[in-house]
C-alpha cells in the first residue's frame, strides 16, 4: 500500500509520496497537482515527492489581485518552511517553470537542482500577442471557452482520439477554474517570461531544460536559448510531443528526470 500524505498549510493544499531527497513538483496554468500522477510512480521509489496546488488552482486559496510571480514564489517558500525543507530539487511545468526560476533567483540556497519543463522564454511580440488573445477569450467567455483549443495544443490528434478519458479529465480541470481568477493568472503567464529572461544567467544550480519537439508555444528554440544562458544547464528535446508530452509519453520524461536526479544527488 502506498504511503501518501496530504495536507494544507496556510491555504496551500499539498501531497507527498516516497522517501529520499525531496523533489517538489510545480504544475502549470489551469490544471492542478493531479497532473503529476503520470510521474509519481517513477519518482517516488527514490525520492520524497511533494506536489501542491498553486494559488487559484485545485484546493488552494486564490491569490491576491493583481497576480504577481512573487506571490507564487512566496507560496513555495511558505510550503517549504511548513514542511521543514531546507533545500530541494524543483520541477516546474509551463507556468510552474517560470515560478521555480523566480524562486531559484530569490532563494538560491534552497534549490539544489532545477528542472524546467515546457516553459516559455523570451517570446516574440507575435508569440505574446497570440497568448494574450487567449487571455482575452478567458476574460470574455470564461475558462471553459479555452479548453478545446488547449487540448489541441497540448496533445497529438492520435493520442487525443485514443484517450478520451484523459481528455475528459483534463478538460474538467480547466473548466473548474474560477472565471475571475483564471484570466488574471493567464495574463501573468503571458507576460512574466519577459521579466525573467535577462536574470536567469544568475541561476547557478544544475538545470535540466526539456520540452516537446512540437510544443509550438514553448518551443525547442526557447529551451535551447534558455539553457545557453544558464551556466550549468542543458536542454533536451523530446521528439514528436506537444505541450503535455509528460502525459502523452510519461516514460520519455520520467526516465530523463530520474537519470538527471541520480546524477545530481549521487
Predicted regions and their residues:
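Short beta-strand/loop motif that positions the catalytic acidic residue
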Residues: 203, 209-211
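Acidic catalytic loop of the alpha/beta-hydrolase fold
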Residues: 213-218
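Flexible "cap/lid" loop of the alpha/beta hydrolase fold
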Residues: 101-106, 111-145
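Conserved alpha/beta-hydrolase catalytic His-Asp/Glu region
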Residues: 125-129, 144-201
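Catalytic active-site module of serine/aspartate enzymes centered on a nucleophile-bearing elbow/loop
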Residues: 233-266
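Conserved acidic catalytic loop of the alpha/beta-hydrolase fold
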Residues: 71-88
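Alpha/beta-hydrolase fold catalytic core
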Residues: 1-23, 45-47, 258-266
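Conserved HGGG/HGGXW glycine-rich cap/lid loop of the alpha/beta-hydrolase fold
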Residues: 12-62, 79
